[in-house]
Amino acid sequence: MVPDQDGELRHDVCSLSTSLRLTAHVTSSIVHEQSSNIRYGENRKHGQRYAYHEPLPPEIVARCNGHDGKHLTLVTRNSKPVNVRLEKRGQSFYISKGWKKFVELTDLRVGQCVRFSVSSPSTLDLLILDKHGTSLAIPPSKRDLKLKSKRSTHQDSKGHPSNTDPGPSRIINRRVTKSESSANTQLLVQYFSKRYPIDHLEQLMTGRTEDIEVQTLVGPSVNMVLHTSTDHRCNLKKGWTDFALSNGIKLNTVCIFHFYKTTHLGVIVDIF
């Protein structure tokens, strides 16, 4: 039995991906090295909504080789891609043409936050967060979860797990290279022992410690342990560091965790 979005119980795959959608980050900031937070609002005048925003961060403009009149595509999980145009005002850049359409499609509200990430010189990936820092992205569907559970995982000649479905190269390429500094690794070990309030997970857990399958939507799964600490919080242990390294997760990376339970406890990690 699993509660649906209205709180009613139904027979199906047990999942917390919709109700939980935790946005985990390692510091008080959710700014990735290639992204920034922009706050948006709305004004009502003559019955119409007007969206306004601050200038795009200089690092975002630089990474997408921005210039006055440049056309970009905004990509978000909440709506279809939107073509926009950059406009330079003084020393700052704003999104002009196409912005109103994007606001209407995503229904941006006062106090929400948009996190930009440059995926190519002409494409910006956007993650929309509410005022509490919780992602408003659409979680994996039941079909995604079922496909993931059926996906076979094999081992290569060295005994490492490898998936038959390589998935989007955007995910695969997010690997930590050998040039990564040891300082990054140390920070990762220190801050990435993921912790979650127990009240969100107790309906899925049967004991104080439970085995859990951790995976990205397209990558191989890793078996870890979800442990309840004395301060009534849950921690991912025994494998998180290797998982983070192999998926390019480091300090200030934003991760969204979708917990579910079928025949076993699992979590799908979205990496931004």
From Swiss-Prot:
Q: Give me the positions annotated for DNA binding.
A: 39-132, 180-272
Any Pfam family the entry gives: B3
Q: Which UniProt keywords apply?
A: DNA-binding, Nucleus, Repeat, Transcription, Transcription regulation
Which species is listed as the source?
Answer: Oryza sativa subsp. japonica (Rice)
Chain positions covered by the region annotation Disordered: 139-171
Put simply, this protein is called B3 domain-containing protein Os10g0323000
Q: What compartments host this protein? A: Nucleus
An example Gene Ontology CC term for this record: nucleus
Compositional bias ranges of the Basic and acidic residues kind: 141-159
InterPro entries in UniProt: B3_DNA-bd, DNA-bd_pseudobarrel_sf, Plant_B3_domain
UniProt GO molecular function: DNA binding
